Amino acid sequence: MKQYKLMQVALLAILLFGWAGCSQNEEEVPGNVRNGIVLNVTDTGIISNEPSTRTEDTGFVTTFTQGDQIGLFAVKDGAILDEINNMPFTFNGSSWSGKPILYDDRLVGVNFYAYYPYQSEMTGKTDLIGDDFFAPLAAGWELTTEQSDQKAYAKQDLMTSNATALIGENGNYSLSFQLTHRMSLVVVKLPSTRYIFTDAEGVAMPEETPYVAMSVDVAFYLDNVEEGTKISPYYDAKKDEYRLLRKPSSENQIIGHYNDKQCTLDTAEKMKEGKYKRFVVDGGYKEVTHHLQVGDYYYADGSVVSGNEAEPAKDNCIGIVCWVGNPMPSVLYKDVAGTPYTATNDALLRSHPNCVHGLVMSLYTETGKFSPALTQSIHDWFMTTSFTSSYVSVTGYYDANENNKNKPLRFLGYNNSEVLDLYYDTFKTDFECFQYQDDCESSFPSPSITTGWYVPSSGELVALQDKDNSLESKLNTKLIKVSDKTMDISATYWSSTERNNKNMYIVTYSKTAGSAGTGGVKTNTYTYRFFLGF
């Protein structure tokens, strides 16, 4: 496997050539054999095929990793030496190892050739007459359309050296190979947006990890959009770009799909050996400063559109921002006297430390049951487990750590969803709420930079309404523009906060407040709205 970096890398490793008179046993020899020949392996990199105003383009350069293998040939007087005929050497992370080769007069005047990745069968794949020893190998090299796996991608990136002579000085010998890439590379940068969220005064909200909305539903095809023409490039998450190895002089059109859009990338006359062509689609990466507010529209790629937008796009809208701020319990309630909420038991902080901006309410809504009646409450089971050090209980009532008048108002939906999952993993009890949650995720897929959808706690639902009737004035007025299902103020809503083995907390609304009640029998039918943190 290889890793690719935009920097020049030279790997210094020991190639185990022994001296005459050393052991000739066919054993694997470590790379630090005394007086061994030093092997310098340098990748010249894949550089841009565009004229550059920079003094240097280091391109995409290969770093070998443990387990990688190169093949070695030695040629003298127009013939390959039998003992160095496609000899494999394996990189162990710091040096190369293989069968020892004894140095003597036979190696005088020998030219060495190396290639990557090693192939066990090389018959007919070298040329002893022309200038390019590996010309047949490169000409017959086959690329697959499946390159999404890093290992599979690396094994298709053919690199070869030119003739390399053994250098001797004061009894020390070395070989220095420069490997050049024989394929060409397509690099695709799809649109992504870094959001800098601010408050009303324009002050940026604190965050440790940049919030970047990336393209979703990405797919690539060769020439035509058909199932048989689909290709899978390698995705570099750190650079947020796709890479596809292509044969030099290939002239396919690459068709990309993303965010319900399509782009066509014409590679004709752009695929050059050892060079890459970068395509930047719709401007690629950009930064946007956004005043985040309740009522903003939230989309499947993580993008956010102002709630003041007159005609927001309906496609890929998955919810409405319903609360702004850091929703982590250890942050929200850190100043509460005797607070039980700490960084240690904050599941949201632990699993999604970047979700510090707010909460989104789903467009999805449905009515149904919550779960079967249980012989033992989830809270009672939870208190007997080791999970008590990593989570807080789902109870809104039986909690010795906090005034039970306040507990139903806490933001604990993500914590509760995790505890419900742990309960299911233990007892395999089918909760209807999971089915609706999965349906929500299927209908309105959440971005990977979020928590994913969960049943909100009673406190999160209560917070939707206030004396200004924000549920209707700030949420429903936005919902109606992207959905035919507004928040029914007369409905009763499920929460993930538990009352006892038979009941969950349910939330109802008036024009001025939300109220959490304990009468939510788990087998009754009430309404669902799901939340996610971002």
UniProtKB/Swiss-Prot annotation:
Compartments where found: Fimbrium; Cell outer membrane
Main location as per UniProt: other
Q: Which GO terms describe its cellular component?
A: cell outer membrane; pilus
Q: Which first-to-last residue range defines the signal peptide? A: 1-21
Cited Pfam families? Mfa_like_1
Look up keyword Chloroplast and say if it applies. no
Say where the lipid (S-diacylglycerol cysteine) is covalently attached. Answer: 22
What UniProt keywords are attached to this protein's entry? Cell outer membrane, Fimbrium, Lipoprotein, Membrane, Palmitate, Signal
* Propeptide residue intervals: 22-54
Indicate where a lipid (N-palmitoyl cysteine) is covalently linked: 22
Q: How does it assemble?
A: May be part of the fimbrial tip.
Function, in words: Probably a component of the fimbrium tip. Fimbriae are filamentous appendages on the cell surface that mediate cell adhesion and biofilm formation.
Family affiliation: Belongs to the bacteroidetes fimbrillin superfamily. Mfa-like family.
What is this protein's name?
A: Putative fimbrium tip subunit Fim1C
**Taxonomic source organism:** Bacteroides ovatus (strain ATCC 8483 / DSM 1896 / JCM 5824 / BCRC 10623 / CCUG 4943 / NCTC 11153)
What lineage does UniProt assign to this protein's organism? Bacteria, Pseudomonadati, Bacteroidota, Bacteroidia, Bacteroidales
